[in-house]
Amino acid sequence: MLQIPFNILDEGFTHGDDPTQPPTVQIEARVAGCFDDGRLRQAMGVALNQHPLARARLEPWTDETVTYEWLIDDVPQVDPMSVVAAATDADVDRIRSELQSHPVSIFESPPLRARLVHRQGGDYLMLAIHHAASDGMGALRLLQSVLRAYANVDDPQPQLDPLDVHRLPVPEFEPGIAELWHAARMEFERFARMGSFPEHLPPQGATARAGYGIQSIHLPLAPISSAPLRTELGASVNDLLITAATLACARWIETHADAVPDRITVTMPINARPKEWRNEVVGNFVTADVVSTSAEERTSARDCLASVAGWTDAVKRVGPGPALAALAAIPSGPVSGRRAFAQWASQAGARFADTTVLSNLGRVNKEWLDTDQLEITELWFSPPTSLPTGLGLGAIATTDRLFLSLRHSWRLWSSEATAQFADTLVTALDEICT
């Protein structure tokens, strides 16, 4: 059995653990045809063996503990997979929601749960991974290993020690003039916008029910990739999605709060893995930035996209180095003190919580699962969310389709309200792309 310390991101997601809003990362694939139960369970075991953090559990800690530790079991303590059948798409939605809404314990290994859903027209493999154990990119990598093992194809691992890189070392950062200018600009913009709080989405059909609902929509990728505004402004697909989310949130507030919103903020997770292994390693290697727009910057879809693209371009130029350095500078001490501070900060800082979160895993190409044994027809992903934000958007694309998941707290919206917001989001995206 191995033992390794948490990195600062693992700790943050542990401190944010709320059983009524579990910090689960949703990742799932649908295939053409049916999975064999026993063969898939065996493939899951092979994949867990490939990735140490997928077999991790939290070592019990005391008030004097200075660093949380992961215990890496040679063999997982429990079988994470269950098998169910779905007769309708509504059944699939319910199963998906229940899986992501059920707390995943990190005191036993593996820190995840899997559900095989038999459905006419193609089976689903759904994973719910505790965010303390992995971010979305790591979850996608684990899913890839499961599917490769099932298809009996090679699953090459990068030439690195996943437990060593898990320390989250701060990359060397020697900014040039351009990087310094962009960093200064970002800080100036942040300071200028401190005079107003982020807007929050008004509830619609909210209940006291714990957990999440998840609305799933898929769109053709080509009209988004080839959008004229994208070419004109040098924007990315992610920029278009953030812009659509920003406009949709603003319109929702205008409609349901009868007010003109000021500052709409979108949390944008950033993959801090180096380019040499950008899509590798189960674990947490993600920082985040906030894309903020004022009402003046949202007067048109073009203006909003220009503002968003300018901000994300500056973020890319600066890179993750400063954010990782800031995280590394957090004072040490007993974990009990840091846990208490994190809980206080979460409550005290609720007014500063962002309007929504949009996490994009990018495009999965054919080589991701290069086999004739399995045909992937759908991929779904969503990040966890908590009130007062209450809405987390997840995006992932294949060669020709974009899959969007809208995860909402039941304490914010009903399924009907989320469906209305999804329509608003798609309308905004259409406006940007035409």
Which positions does each model-derived feature cover?
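A general secondary-structure junction signal
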Residues: 58-62, 118, 268-272, 360-362
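Non-catalytic N-terminal regions of enzymes
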Residues: 1-172, 236-257, 369-434
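Flexible, P/S/T/G-rich "lid" or insertion loops adjacent to the active sites of thioester-utilizing
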Residues: 181-235
